[in-house]
Amino acid sequence: MHKKSSTLIRKREISDVTKESKVVLKSDQQWREQLSEQEYHVCREQGTEPPFSGKLLHNKDSGEYACTCCHAPLFSSVNKYDSGCGWPSFDAPINETAVLYLDDFSHGMKRVEIRCARCDSHLGHVFPDGPKTTGERFCVNSVSLIFNKIETNE
């Protein structure tokens, strides 16, 4: 279970990520030029795509889900499952340093927001109602992900 939800811990994690990998820092204008309007709204303004509308919701191919903004690996198809919530769901990130956790008190709720550790892009939220494997449900906007299919010899 994650316990990484305070701003102080998040700042420390960003510092740790900086030491281990290249953090992507861009101006607001650069993000606007790179991303579509919907990608910008979700990834940079913490928006949410409508449920059951995402292109990756029903994807069952084997591969890796990466950040739309910086292409950092975030989730594996091995961890994807159908939670019925209307957004792609995973029981864990691809590794412990792929995502950041941040308390989110918006809309009168207490949730835990997840962001890309490399570029600080909004991905979605994590909830403690996932499958028995981890008990967590990483609920992610499709628009915040790109899918890299693993080619098989089948």
Curated annotation (Swiss-Prot):
Key words, A-Z:
Metal-binding, Oxidoreductase, Zinc
InterPro entries noted in UniProt? Met_Sox_Rdtase_MsrB (IPR028427), Met_Sox_Rdtase_MsrB_dom (IPR002579), Mss4-like_sf (IPR011057)
- Per the entry, which co-factors are needed? Zn(2+)
Q: Which GO terms describe its cellular component?
A: cytoplasm
Its transmembrane ranges are none
Q: What is its EC number?
A: 1.8.4.12
What does the record say about how the cofactor binds?
Binds 1 zinc ion per subunit. The zinc ion is important for the structural integrity of the protein.
Location of the active site: 139
Molecular functions (GO terms): peptide-methionine (R)-S-oxide reductase activity; zinc ion binding
What does it catalyze? L-methionyl-[protein] + [thioredoxin]-disulfide + H2O = L-methionyl-(R)-S-oxide-[protein] + [thioredoxin]-dithiol
Alphabetical GO biological process terms: protein repair; response to oxidative stress
Q: Where is the MsrB domain?
A: 28-150
Q: What HAMAP family does UniProt report for this protein, alphabetically?
A: MsrB
- Provide the protein name: Peptide methionine sulfoxide reductase MsrB
Organism, as annotated: Vibrio vulnificus (strain CMCP6)
